[in-house]
Amino acid sequence: MKEKVSMVSLGCPKNLVDAEVMLGCLAKDQYEITTDEHEADIIIVNTCSFIGDAKKESIDTILDLADRKHDGRCKLLVVTGCLPQRYQEELATELPEVDIFVGTADYPRIAEIIAEKRGVAEQLRYISDPNYIFDESLPRLKSSPAYTAYLKIAEGCSNCCSYCVIPSLRGALRSRPLDNLLMEARTLVATGTREINLIAQDITAWGRDLPGSPTLEELVRELAKIVGLRWIRLLYAYPDGITDGLIEIIKTEPKVCKYLDIPIQHISDPVLKRMNRRSTEPQIRALIAKIRAEIPEIALRTSLIVGFPGETEEDFRTLLHYVEETQFDRLGVFCYSREEGTPAAGMEDQVSERVKRDRYKKLMKVQARLSFKRNRRLIDTEEEVIVEGYSDETDLLLKGRSSRQAPDIDGQVYITAGNANVGDIVRLRITDSSDYDLIGEIVEE
């Protein structure tokens, strides 16, 4: 009888791709994959440790699933990813329930590693220098719906922002070759994928370390040639890497969603300098103005950090006013997390947790109002929407996402009239909206 494996993946989509590679390797090695942890002989927790909240979620999940070794059939608990890569010594002591720790360099060896545990009583650790990069020859068992997929175009990061632990956990930038990416993309489309979301720590850095230094716009142009692919979405595009050529291909290529995720993190120059960000306030303002002028219909998402060391009330007011002025369509806000080993952790003028939370609430309150306002502008317009199934609230409504909404992080569209199948891309007339969601009816073609 095949042993059953269950996987819980935490954190970002980049982590999800790593989890899918491990599942693919295990399925190829004759393990049976199950989504029910109670049925699993082996449970794997793929962790995140980017910020404090992510670490807490990872630890809580590990402790919860450790109970399956007592009240379920679980024989092995395996913890993979960023948390063991960063805290291997501490975790080995504090989590004796865990049988195997695997860092970010050994995902393709997961089946071999589990086999090495047979007959070995002591806890095992496999933590190597982070040099892994996904290759299209590795199996990948996609866990997301067939119609959508993430395409991880690079691993690691060489930006060295002062608050970030990613370079120490994932290593320096390592881009996947163009032909490698195109091969995987074609395979995804051949198995039903209609939307590909490009991801990396910084997608604009893709190609800098490859022979000939190919650019992101070259990659997008080649992806757009794939027959059957309908949407290409760009996530995690650092502002200093966005070129006129990239703006032009978003503007002119029909398959590229009029959507761009640009994590600016702040707008005040003193804060940006302490963050070791390469963009300045004038440069960010000019970039956003240029994008909006060239592509008026584009949906812009950004990420911001509040409470960074030394952030004054004046810095925060500058940020708040900029958000009100710019009116981003989507906004993610994070309270600064003091991460040991980063330059920012040792900075003076650390901001209190109370002030961080207060600034977070103020910013999100403003964004809710702005998002509602921008959504109202879409009423009586038509949008392309990918159908994702029935609404969570009622099976009388279908739900989906427009090309202006990324999976998992943005709002949804609720479909009140018309028929469609999951994965269909339909035209929808927007009839109403809320702070973050849209409501509409399918337009018969």
UniProtKB/Swiss-Prot annotation:
Radical SAM core domain residues:
143-373
What stretch or stretches form a coiled coil here?
none
Q: Which PROSITE patterns does this entry report, sorted A to Z?
A: MTTASE_N (PS51449), MTTASE_RADICAL (PS01278), RADICAL_SAM (PS51918), TRAM (PS50926)
| E.C. number(s) listed in UniProt | 2.8.4.4
Q: Which GO terms describe its molecular function?
A: 4 iron, 4 sulfur cluster binding; aspartic acid methylthiotransferase activity; metal ion binding; protein methylthiotransferase activity
Residues reported in the UniProt entry to bind [4Fe-4S] cluster 2: 157, 161, 164
One GO-annotated biological process of the protein: tRNA modification
Q: Where in the cell is it found?
A: Cytoplasm
Boundaries of each TRAM domain copy?
A: 376-444
Highest taxon in the source lineage: Bacteria
Report the top EC class in one word: transferase
Alphabetically sorted, this entry's keywords are:
4Fe-4S, Cytoplasm, Iron, Iron-sulfur, Metal-binding, S-adenosyl-L-methionine, Transferase
Q: Does the keyword 4Fe-4S apply?
A: yes
What InterPro entries does its record include?
Elp3/MiaA/NifB-like_rSAM, Methylthiotransferase, Methylthiotransferase_CS, Methylthiotransferase_N, Methylthiotransferase_N_sf, NA-bd_OB-fold, Ribosomal_uS12_MeSTrfase_RimO, rSAM
By sequence similarity, the record places it as follows: Belongs to the methylthiotransferase family. RimO subfamily.
User: What protein does this entry describe?
Assistant: Ribosomal protein uS12 methylthiotransferase RimO
> What species is given as this protein's source?
Geobacter metallireducens (strain ATCC 53774 / DSM 7210 / GS-15)
* Phylogenetic placement of the source organism: Bacteria, Pseudomonadati, Thermodesulfobacteriota, Desulfuromonadia, Geobacterales
Chain's gene name: rimO
